[in-house]
Swiss-Prot record:
Protein name: Photosystem II reaction center protein T
Record GO biological process: photosynthesis
Membrane topology: Single-pass membrane protein
Subcellular location field: Plastid, Chloroplast thylakoid membrane
Gene from which the chain derives: psbT
C-alpha cells in the first residue's frame, strides 16, 4: 500500500512540474 502512495506522489510531482513548465511556455508558443 505504501508503494502505491509513493508512486502516486512521484507521478503527481512530475505532473505538476511538467504542467507548470508547459503553462509557462504556452503563451510564448501561442504568440
Amino acid at each position: 500500500m505504501e508503494a502505491l502512495v509513493y508512486t502516486f506522489l512521484l507521478i503527481g510531482t512530475l505532473g505538476v512540474i511538467f504542467f507548470a513548465i508547459f503553462f509557462r511556455e504556452s503563451p510564448r508558443i501561442n504568440k
